[in-house]
């Protein structure tokens, strides 16, 4: 059976994913599925760099604003809804474009990972809650060492600061009995062309810093306060970068400048982790639209046409 064709656009913040996705969607009758774990939440717009209503009017967008802040939206939910959307979009003879940077979500969709049923998702959530409670009482290093005892190979590849990934590795082992490091990706579910956008590290970091300043000017602090006031009932949604860093400021424990600097630092670290994950986990074709826009845009268009004709 012939596989459905999809294009995936990945990369850290500030490298041109949105602009490229809109251009490709216009040229190829595409519909865009957000692959970002935080953009599913209503009202979290600025901190998640959500596409604007004007941008959404250019091409159909999906999996944006589909959950309230107090709802859980898991990789299982994304996988199920994403697969259904790909089938519907393909049936309309349009091209699905997956745009975003949440590694586990993309992997679950592209490789058809077995994530279990809704009941299993509930079990995952209880295990996740257990380790998050552990983290509140212990250090990141303690959490990482708990993983290292069970799965040293996974721990060697996951930095202690990436607590979400560490907890996910612990979840996988406790749920399935299979070590996270021994999970082998299956064959790609779709006929997939993956575009990775990046630029030189100093340029990327400067763009991230500028992006954070622009978000602050656009009202990020007010949005973070809105999330802060709902943090007790929204543990998953308020963990996103761009929100949690302001909580100490709201509590009077640090200055606004320090909170903004922390957002910038965490955003830079996250971008570095994203790039490492993309290089190691999925077959990406890399381009630089920041420093080589004209040449690489032409190369992208040529490579897409070659792939479409296969």
Swiss-Prot record:
Entries under HAMAP family matching the protein: IPP_trans
EC number per UniProt: 2.5.1.75
Family designation: Belongs to the IPP transferase family.
Function noted in UniProt: Catalyzes the transfer of a dimethylallyl group onto the adenine at position 37 in tRNAs that read codons beginning with uridine, leading to the formation of N6-(dimethylallyl)adenosine (i(6)A).
InterPro entries associated with the record: Dimethylallyltransferase, IPT, P-loop_NTPase
Oligomer status and interactors: Monomer.
GO molecular function: ATP binding; tRNA dimethylallyltransferase activity
SUPFAM superfamilies: P-loop containing nucleoside triphosphate hydrolases
Gene3D superfamilies linked: 1.10.20.140, P-loop containing nucleotide triphosphate hydrolases (3.40.50.300)
Catalytic reaction annotation: adenosine(37) in tRNA + dimethylallyl diphosphate = N(6)-dimethylallyladenosine(37) in tRNA + diphosphate
UniProt entry keywords in alphabetical sequence: ATP-binding, Magnesium, Nucleotide-binding, Transferase, tRNA processing
Binding-site residues, substrate: 13-18
Amino acids binding ATP: 11-18
Cofactor(s) listed: Mg(2+)
Annotated source species: Latilactobacillus sakei subsp. sakei (strain 23K) (Lactobacillus sakei subsp. sakei)
Name assigned to this protein: tRNA dimethylallyltransferase
Site feature location: Interaction with substrate tRNA: 102, 128
Signal peptide boundaries: none
Gene Ontology terms: biological process: tRNA modification
